[in-house]
């Protein structure tokens, strides 16, 4: 009996774009739930508003381009971008900020370059940087975590502040800790205190800190880490970029901490503060804007981790993942060019 051998590949993975996006969104949910638990319903409101704007903008652009609206919406890429923007901005930021940011991400960053698969920059991070540069006060005004807050916003409070309706609530009352002092994020607090001459140990006696990490933020990062590990298990992402991000940040922060423990945050503090785990597993791993080869992905991720540490400690913004990711996006083509495997019979590069 003669057997016919089919052409390669002989093993395939039936993972469509929509399936991958669905898995990423589902793995984001633990982090979203924990974030809402510590920072109130505002985060969920921002996410839902971002989804509405993203899907509307996606449909409008597809109609203008005379493409299939149903096919574009069903790939879930616009929804994922919306969720990432929603969890990245302060929970009680004005409604028009999330509208501007999400519309910019979908219309300009994604579709101006040709749509899904053609954008040069991560849409969510480009939107975040636009908002941070344009509205720095609103983008750096976080409320106190619920466990140390004097007052926690209810659903009604969140809606009133986000949509600026009613006059019986004020943002300032939700920034107060149990000691009556207005709170910033742990990264912001440490950076400000160090610039005022306090040591790391003195700064971390404040209520916003819980041991070596920040109140609430440790658990938020732990939840995103758990979701990220599930993503790896499901093979929705590869390990190279996430490992590179965490390794680069860990090594850079370890060197800084060893050289000056009184003026630098510990590696544990950097790994479990701000958007570290969210960015490492859900943002930096965007396959469109990252390097493509295994070695290139490791370099890409490591570059992000090192840039985050440099900007956090030397720059003007306490959390730096958006800038680090966009800078690495710029470097991705060069990384691919110099580390791509040599084709047989041709020189490398």
From Swiss-Prot:
Its EC number is 7.-.-.-. InterPro entries: NqrB/RnfD (IPR004338), RnfD_bac (IPR011303). It is an enzyme of class 7 (translocase). GO terms for biological process: electron transport chain; transmembrane transport. It is found in: Cell inner membrane. Its cofactor is FMN. GO terms for cellular component: plasma membrane. Its main location: membrane. It comes from the Bacteria. The modification FMN phosphoryl threonine is found at residue 185. It is a multi-pass membrane protein. Pfam families: NQR2_RnfD_RnfE (PF03116). The chain crosses the membrane at residues 20-42, 77-99, 124-144, 212-232, 239-259, 265-285, 291-311, 315-335. Keywords: Cell inner membrane, Cell membrane, Electron transport, Flavoprotein, FMN, Membrane, Phosphoprotein, Translocase, Transmembrane, Transmembrane helix, Transport. The keyword Phosphoprotein applies. The complex is composed of six subunits: RnfA, RnfB, RnfC, RnfD, RnfE and RnfG. Part of a membrane-bound complex that couples electron transfer with translocation of ions across the membrane. Belongs to the NqrB/RnfD family. This is Ion-translocating oxidoreductase complex subunit D. The gene is rnfD.
């Amino acid at each position: 009996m003669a057997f016919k051998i089919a052409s390669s590949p002989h093993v395939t993975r039936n993972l469509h774009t929509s399936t991958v996006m669905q898995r990423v969104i589902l793995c984001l949910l633990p982090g979203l739930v924990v974030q809402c638990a510590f920072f109130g319903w505002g985060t969920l409101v921002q996410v839902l508003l971002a989804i509405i704007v993203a899907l509307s903008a996606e449909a409008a652009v597809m109609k203008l381009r005379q493409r299939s609206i149903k096919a574009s919406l069903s790939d879930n890429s616009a929804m994922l971008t919306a969720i990432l923007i929603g969890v990245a901005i302060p929970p009680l930021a004005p409604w028009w900020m999330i509208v501007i940011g999400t519309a910019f991400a979908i219309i300009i960053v994604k579709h101006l370059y040709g749509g899904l698969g053609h954008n040069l920059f991560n849409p969510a991070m480009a939107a975040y940087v636009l908002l941070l540069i344009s509205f720095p006060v609103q983008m750096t005004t976080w409320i106190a975590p619920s466990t140390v807050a004097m007052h926690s916003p209810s659903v009604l409070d969140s809606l009133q502040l986000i949509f600026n309706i009613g006059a019986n609530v004020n943002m300032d009352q939700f920034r107060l800790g149990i000691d009556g002092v207005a709170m910033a994020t742990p990264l912001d607090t440490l950076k400000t205190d160090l610039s005022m001459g306090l040591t790391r140990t003195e700064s971390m006696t404040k209520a916003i800190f819980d041991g070596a990490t920040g109140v609430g933020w440790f658990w938020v990062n732990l939840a995103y880490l758990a979701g990220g590990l599930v993503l790896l298990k499901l093979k929705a992402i590869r390990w190279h970029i996430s490992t590179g991000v965490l390794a680069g940040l860990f090594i850079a922060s370890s060197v800084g901490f060893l050289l000056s423990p009184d003026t630098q945050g510990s590696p544990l503090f950097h790994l479990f503060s701000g958007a570290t785990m969210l960015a490492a597993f859900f943002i930096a791993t965007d396959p469109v804007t990252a390097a493509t080869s295994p070695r290139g992905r490791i370099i890409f991720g490591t570059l992000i981790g090192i840039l985050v540490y440099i900007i956090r400690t030397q720059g003007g913004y306490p959390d730096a993942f958006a800038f680090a990711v966009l800078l690495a996006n710029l470097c991705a083509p060069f990384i691919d060019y110099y580390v791509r495997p040599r084709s047989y019979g041709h020189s490398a590069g």
